[in-house]
């Protein structure tokens, strides 16, 4: 089985530790960063399959980070992470090229299903280009 590589971008360190631990137990390779600038720098050096991207972060917003990921790393799928108050941002993310969005709080199995679907979507798109 192929191990999916995921980058989680969120400004809450405790949330990052929790998600990393829970996804790693489910055979997902997880790296974490705390802001959009760090995400873009990480992606330049370490390609991943899926980015889980918080909408609301200090500095470069999740939406602006998404725009840069779509421009520079077109084979990387993005799942926007949003709170109930920012549902519109998740929908905006979809219109800007995110694969999906998920509302906090969420179940880890729901997130894992979306990660797997995003991974498969990217894999099929890459195969069609060959």
Per-region residue spans from a language model:
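Charged docking surfaces used in two-component/phosphorelay signaling
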Residues: 17-25
């Amino acid at each position: 089985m192929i191990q999916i590589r995921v980058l989680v971008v969120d400004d809450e360190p405790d949330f990052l530790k929790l998600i990393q631990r829970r996804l790693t137990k489910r055979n997902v390779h997880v790296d974490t960063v705390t802001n959009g600038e760090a995400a873009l720098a990480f992606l330049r050096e370490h390609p991943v399959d899926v980015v889980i991207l918080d909408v609301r972060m200090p500095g470069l917003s999740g939406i602006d980070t998404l725009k840069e990921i779509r421009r520079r790393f077109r084979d990387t799928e993005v799942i926007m992470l949003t709170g109930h108050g920012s549902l519109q941002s998740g929908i905006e993310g979809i219109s800007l090229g995110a694969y999906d969005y998920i509302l906090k709080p969420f179940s880890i199995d729901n997130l894992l299903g979306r990660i797997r679907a995003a991974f498969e979507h990217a894999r099929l798109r890459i195969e069609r280009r060959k």
